[in-house]
Amino acid sequence: MSTFVIAIILFAITYILLFTLPKFRHWIAFGSAVVFSLWLGLIAKDVEFTFKDVFGAIDFNVLMMIAGTMGIVVLFIESKMPMLIADVLLSKFKNVKLAIVAMAILAGVVSAFVDNVATVLMIAPIALAVCKKQNISPVAPIISIAVSSNLQGAATLVGDTTSILLGGYADMNFFDFFVFKGKPSIFWAVEIGAFLTALILLYLFRKETQPLTLSDRTKVEDYVPTFLMCGVIVLLILASFLPKPAGGALLTLYNLRNGIICMILLVVGLIINACQTKKSDMTKKVVKEMDYQTLLLLASLFVVIQGITSAGVINKLAELLVDLGGSNLFLMYTIIVFASVIISAFVDNIPYVLTMLPVVTGVAATMNVEPYVLYFGLLVGATLGGNITPIGASANITGIGILRKEGYEVKAKEFMKISVPFTLTAVLSGYLIIWLFWGIL
């Protein structure tokens, strides 16, 4: 049996188990990563897969960013600022439905400028505080926050790794995501999708009309964590404008810049807290409450995806898309969008987009057309496709991890009740808007 076929079988078994045994997702992913590493590294003769490849597959920038933000979130929660923000939200909206949608919109706005995972970690404590005050389940609000952050990540150059990949490949700057070559760019397609998905959320939560219970305003005990959270947002935005070094140690630091920022701010917060309290209790609490299961799950999935990439599965999918599209631009655009949605629901969209960008460029050259409509279609499909399943995007995995720590195990069916209508609405609107401006006009 060929390496290609075995890789597909292993990958299929992994994802079936991930869906059917949600409590053990981290161990399943870890086991799969070990199997892929040993098999490709020691047994398969036609693929070179070394320890360096395994280590290189793990995105330490993302893991450090998640870990650092998780720690800052612990400080943020202890300061009681999320409770105060929850009090403000409760005073501004009439019922639970409007409060949930408002939090999802807030997550989307923040995520347009900050990494999706960091956004979920920032907004989730507010949602949890609102739900605790109202004595309702936080499952639906957290899912809404996760999928909203994924949607808006494609809006700007700094919102998501896939946007950064496209910007670098197509030589697009921050403002090109708003207006490009005299036409409305991808930002507007995403924002129209965000408006329509807000209506979808209003419909999905139409029965949550119970009035909000108001209480006395919470008193914030420490404002330092709030400044740290704001610092994360500002510094992550500024870091996205740093020029990429040519190589060496500076390039390594550049590739880890978001993670380094979050970890440094966490250390600063812990030092300030220790100086204020003369104790190390908060450091112990941060270490204890870190979501190690989510970190292990993500690290393992990075290796699994690298495994099927090395086995040629992603390249084969790209070739298949080219064969199906032929010379019809609209058909090719349609195939790229919806195939990207389906593929990204199950595999990490970063290696997929990396693989497809040169493929799309070649297809456009063959068809003698500009590649931008295909670039934007690829970005929309690949970014939003991860929204469909609970393990399709890092933000979803993070949200599920937060809920698990709160005692809620979320099944795929429960997640997809929100994610599927949300994603279909966002994809269809983006698909039509992009084709209107870049395929017709």
Segments the model singles out, each with a brief description of its role:
Residues F49-V139, T294-M367, P371:
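Membrane-embedded alpha-helical segments and adjacent helix-loop junctions characteristic
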Residues H26, N61, L98, V139, ...:
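Residues that define the loop-to-transmembrane-helix transition and helix capping
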Residues I85, A118-A129, I142-I143, A155-A170, ...:
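Re-entrant/interfacial helical elements at transmembrane boundaries that shape
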Residues I16-K23, L106-D115, A146-V158, F338-Y352, ...:
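Transmembrane alpha-helix interface/packing and boundary motifs in multi-pass membrane proteins
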Residues N135, V179-A189, S300, F330-L441:
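C-terminal transmembrane helix pair
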Residues V130-T226, E370, I397-L432:
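Membrane-core helix-loop-helix motifs of multi-pass transport proteins
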Residues M1-E78, L84, G182-E319, K417-L441:
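Hydrophobic transmembrane alpha-helices of multi-pass small-molecule transporters
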